[in-house]
Amino acid sequence: MKQLYGVIGNPIGHSLSPVMHNDAFEHLNMDAHYHAFLVKEEVLGEAVRGLKALGISGFNVTTPHKVAIMDYLDEIDPLAKQIGAVNTVVHKDGKLIGYNTDGIGFVKALQSISSEPLQEKRILLLGAGGASRAIYFSLADVGVKEIDVANRTVDKAKELITACTATVHSVALSLEEATEEQENYDIIIQTTTIGMHPRVEHTPLQISSLKKGTIVSDIIYNPFETKILCEAKEQGAMIQNGIDMFVYQGALAFEMWTGRTPNIERMKQLVIRKLGG
């Protein structure tokens, strides 16, 4: 019997997840299908109950449901509970279990380009929203000890830092302070929507002086190279856009659902092609 998977969100027509997962199913000769479901906020509960009743094997959760979905699940993974958001649901033994693969997907993407362990790195996070929180908690979860957070509203950065129970040395900074301190970091991670199409001329941080070997990562992938990545490249930094994070979080969900490991590079190249790269 064909296994059913999917993604719920609103809007959902732009999602690249169906293309990525269905190609992986085909490549691995699996009898499964992944479908995008448009689910409005006011019917989220009914939709989740319906998916469970239909016997869906698992599904992803995207905007605007990542927080609200938690009220409709039977169990929530401890890391997802700490992050306060779920993006992956596994249907197992009659229960819907929520996980967050966004943060750990980002960590795996970062590990794929870093020649040294992340635990030894001093990291700067730009932004203190949902994506930043997932990344901060996941970096802490793998043992990173120094993570500073810079945000337009410093109090929001402080809130993120104090919410984490792991032993991490962190300082909350203004964006101006982060600009002055940028050469003290091994890795800079941009987690806001600043610089996303169509406002591509914007950047949260003017890159002017980086130490040698710095990695600058931006979770945005439209455009492929945001202003902050262009400036970092000019400074000689290794850069990474948001495609890797998207692919790795999807691959982690795929493994949780199926127990099979998809071809990461195949997934990545497919997404790049679909984005017109």
UniProtKB/Swiss-Prot annotation:
Involved in the biosynthesis of the chorismate, which leads to the biosynthesis of aromatic amino acids. Catalyzes the reversible NADPH linked reduction of 3-dehydroshikimate (DHSA) to yield shikimate (SA). It comes from Bacillus cereus (strain AH187). It catalyses: shikimate + NADP(+) = 3-dehydroshikimate + NADPH + H(+). The keyword Amino-acid biosynthesis applies. The active site is at K66 (proton acceptor). Its EC number is 1.1.1.25. One of its GO terms (cellular component) is cytosol. NADP(+) binds at G127, A128, G129, G130, A131, N151, R152, T153, V154, D155, K156, I219, G242. One of its GO terms (biological process) is amino acid biosynthetic process. This is Shikimate dehydrogenase (NADP(+)). Homodimer. Belongs to the shikimate dehydrogenase family. Pfam families: SDH_C, Shikimate_DH, Shikimate_dh_N. Keywords: Amino-acid biosynthesis, Aromatic amino acid biosynthesis, NADP, Oxidoreductase. Pathway: Metabolic intermediate biosynthesis; chorismate biosynthesis; chorismate from D-erythrose 4-phosphate and phosphoenolpyruvate: step 4/7. Shikimate binds at S15, L16, S17, T62, N87, D102, Y221. GO terms for molecular function: NADP binding; shikimate 3-dehydrogenase (NADP+) activity.
